[in-house]
């Protein structure tokens, strides 16, 4: 989406100002994607989100070829020119390189080595060395002399990667919005969430998605998209419609936690019905208005 693109490019602008020397492409793009996937709540970011689409793309690639990711030392040695030359005109390789860069930065920021020591201090040390003028590949080798162990741990990590709860709920609400849009375009205008669920179950609706070479279907049980992360149906106060414009589907408002709200609104572009899901974080000090999802 445009919002994710802006967050991604904003990091690149920040990096140009914050670092005296250019970051290697895997690190620059990996960090940019960490911010791309972050949830903006209106006044802060919720970082380190793992969206389901990333998991699908990465694990589908690994299932087809367990050696599909580049050797980490080779990845660290890529210059910006190498990176650009390799992915220009090759969408599949470009998608692969970006996903590997994202996964590696996420791994280094969030995981521990075999001795239980967080990798994050070493990632910060790597950034400092590059900023001090070390050649990126030399900085990588000095910070990660145990690259074979790192490679093995990273491979295990990406194989077991799972979506974060917040990102999973956001995707589910986006799928629910796709369902509501289909009902609306077929002349069915449910007055509330329960009517929408009954209409979808009665019509045995299912959606089909594709991203690159990866295809997936919506859950055959549409109740999934009316439920929380533990599979319990939301109450009508936690998940509801809010009518804004008569010519458009109602906004979908869902509160999944005390302070966070998902708010999906619909709009038209060129006669096509589109939607966007925003995340709002409410303050405990003020009245909580049920117009967003936690």
Which functions belong to the PLM regions below?
Residues 11-12, 33:
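A broadly conserved amphipathic alpha-helix scaffold signal in soluble, globular proteins
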Residues 1, 20-192:
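Acidic/His/Gly-enriched intrinsically disordered linker/tail segments
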Residues 92, 128-294:
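Beta/coil-rich, acidic/histidine-enriched accessory regions frequently appended to metallopeptidases
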Residues 2-11:
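Short alpha-helix carrying the canonical HExxH Zn2+-binding catalytic motif
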Residues 13-17:
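Short alpha-helical functional segments enriched in proximate histidine and acidic residues
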């Amino acid at each position: 989406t445009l919002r994710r693109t802006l967050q991604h490019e904003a990091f690149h602008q920040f990096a140009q100002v914050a670092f005296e020397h250019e970051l290697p492409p895997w690190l620059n793009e990996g960090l940019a994607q960490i911010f791309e996937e972050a949830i903006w709540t209106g006044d802060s970011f919720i970082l380190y989100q793992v969206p389901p689409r990333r998991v699908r793309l990465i694990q589908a690639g690994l299932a087809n070829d367990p050696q599909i990711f580049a050797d980490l030392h080779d990845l660290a040695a890529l210059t910006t020119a190498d990176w650009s030359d390799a992915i220009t005109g090759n969408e599949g390789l470009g998608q692969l390189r970006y996903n590997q860069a994202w996964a590696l930065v996420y791994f280094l920021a969030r995981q521990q080595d075999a001795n239980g020591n967080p990798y994050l201090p070493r990632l910060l040390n790597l950034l400092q060395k590059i900023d001090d003028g070390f050649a990126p590949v030399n900085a990588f080798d000095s910070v990660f002399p145990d690259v074979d162990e790192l490679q093995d741990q990273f491979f295990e990590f990406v194989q077991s990667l799972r979506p974060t709860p917040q990102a999973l709920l956001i995707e589910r609400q986006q799928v629910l919005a796709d369902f509501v849009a289909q009902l609306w375009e077929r002349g069915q205008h449910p007055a509330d969430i329960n009517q929408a669920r009954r209409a979808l179950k009665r019509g045995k609706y299912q959606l089909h998605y594709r991203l690159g070479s990866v295809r997936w279907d919506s859950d055959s049980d549409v109740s999934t998209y009316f439920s929380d992360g533990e599979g319990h149906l939301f109450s009508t106060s936690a998940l509801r419609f809010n009518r804004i414009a008569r010519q458009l589907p109602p906004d979908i408002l869902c509160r999944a936690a005390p302070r966070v709200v998902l708010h999906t609104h619909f709009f038209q572009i060129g006669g096509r019905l589109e939607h966007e899901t925003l995340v709002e974080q409410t303050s405990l000090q003020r009245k909580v208005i049920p117009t967003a999802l936690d």
